């Protein structure tokens, strides 16, 4: 687990330091196709991305809607939805951090807020640029707007690259911290099992620890009593039989109590097993899904992100 944790951190740092270089439009499209939108915030961001791709076509329909406020209003709604889901995901993760130091919580919160702010700034810049284009377009009614469309298209390509980079940076950070939480939870369950194991073993040996010494002491006492009674001239046969029966009754009661203790301990262990095994299995399944998702996300983002061409 520790080795995988270290590998995820190294991957996160390497992805954050990647440079952005030009490249063909089709490559960026393929990269976005590998986006693992399993979380609500990832799905919301996917809707923002798809709408932005449609706007970038600058078709006649897009041009008509850009002259009104419809495009910017739609982007605003998609952006607000995305940031709302991002904040909810961050809050949930911070709650799951559990018994870590306040310093660690503060550092994680600061890093996630910074990544979240970068993503929000990217979407805000897209919206602002389209609002600016709308004003320029309205001022050029009846004139050629080809140059204006070219500048907007180039700017949107640049913003799509930045948006993809910052989105995957946030995704990797969330994955790394979530992996640490699952590792800690699984380790805690294993520790609890290690502590409960000896309890079951002790309960299983209660019968031997209690009944055997009692039996030995009872037999020794009976022998001493027989010797004393014989020396005193008393008949000991019936009396010893009575004593033996009493000893057997005491022994049976002790054995019954020991068995009850053992059964209670076994039942307690069974309840704990039924409580924690589904949790461990669920965490192991989520861990496997997380590792696969991180590997796909990291493998889909090369050290240099190509630019786009219409």
Swiss-Prot record:
The keyword rRNA processing belongs to this UniProt entry's keyword annotation: no
Region of interest called Homooligomerization, as start-end residue ranges on this chain: 259-310
Superkingdom field: Eukaryota
Start-end of each Sequence repeat: 77-98, 99-120, 121-142, 143-164, 165-186, 187-208, 209-226, 227-248
Annotated stretches, region: Lipid-binding and lipoprotein association: 207-283
Protein name, per record: Apolipoprotein E
Pfam families, alphabetized: Apolipoprotein
Signal peptide bounds: 1-18
Region of interest (LDL and other lipoprotein receptors binding), residue spans: 155-165
GO cellular component: chylomicron; extracellular exosome; high-density lipoprotein particle; low-density lipoprotein particle; multivesicular body, internal vesicle; very-low-density lipoprotein particle
One function term, GO molecular function aspect: heparin binding
Keyword list, A-Z: Chylomicron, Endosome, Extracellular matrix, Glycoprotein, HDL, Heparin-binding, Lipid transport, Lipid-binding, Oxidation, Phosphoprotein, Repeat, Secreted, Signal, Transport, VLDL
One GO process term, biological-process aspect: cholesterol metabolic process
Family: Belongs to the apolipoprotein A1/A4/E family.
Entry annotated with the keyword Transcription: no
Post-translational modification as stated in the protein's UniProt record: APOE exists as multiple glycosylated and sialylated glycoforms within cells and in plasma. The extent of glycosylation and sialylation are tissue and context specific. Glycated in plasma VLDL.
Binding positions (heparin): 159-162, 222-229
């Amino acid at each position: 687990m520790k080795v995988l944790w270290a590998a995820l951190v190294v991957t996160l740092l390497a992805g954050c330091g990647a440079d952005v270089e030009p490249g063909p439009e089709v490559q960026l499209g393929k990269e976005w196709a590998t986006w693992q939108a399993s979380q609500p915030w990832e799905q919301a961001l996917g809707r923002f991305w798809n709408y932005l791709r449609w706007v970038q076509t600058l078709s006649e329909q897009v041009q008509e809607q850009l002259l009104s406020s419809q495009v910017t209003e739609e982007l605003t709604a998609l952006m607000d939805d995305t940031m709302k889901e991002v904040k909810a995901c961050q809050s949930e993760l911070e709650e799951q951090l559990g018994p870590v130091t306040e310093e660690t919580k503060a550092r994680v919160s600061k890093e996630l807020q910074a990544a979240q702010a970068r993503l929000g700034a990217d979407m805000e810049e897209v919206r602002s640029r389209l609002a600016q284009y709308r004003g320029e377009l309205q001022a050029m009614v009846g004139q050629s707007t080809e140059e204006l469309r070219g500048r907007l298209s180039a700017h949107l390509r640049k913003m799509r690259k930045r948006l993809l980079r910052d989105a995957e940076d946030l995704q990797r950070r969330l994955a790394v911290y979530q992996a640490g939480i699952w590792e800690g939870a699984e380790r805690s369950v294993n520790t609890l099992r290690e502590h409960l194991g000896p309890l079951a073993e002790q309960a299983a040996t209660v019968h031997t620890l209690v009944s055997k010494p009692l039996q030995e002491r009872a037999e020794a006492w009976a022998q001493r009593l027989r010797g004393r009674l014989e020396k005193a001239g008393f008949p000991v046969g019936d009396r010893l039989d009575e004593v033996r029966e009493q000893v057997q009754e005491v022994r049976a009661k002790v054995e019954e109590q020991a068995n009850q203790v053992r059964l209670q301990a076994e039942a307690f262990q069974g309840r704990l097993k039924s409580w924690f095994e589904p949790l461990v299995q669920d965490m192991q399944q989520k861990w496997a899904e997380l590792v696969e998702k991180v590997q796909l996300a990291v493998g889909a983002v090369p050290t240099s992100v190509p630019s786009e061409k219409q």
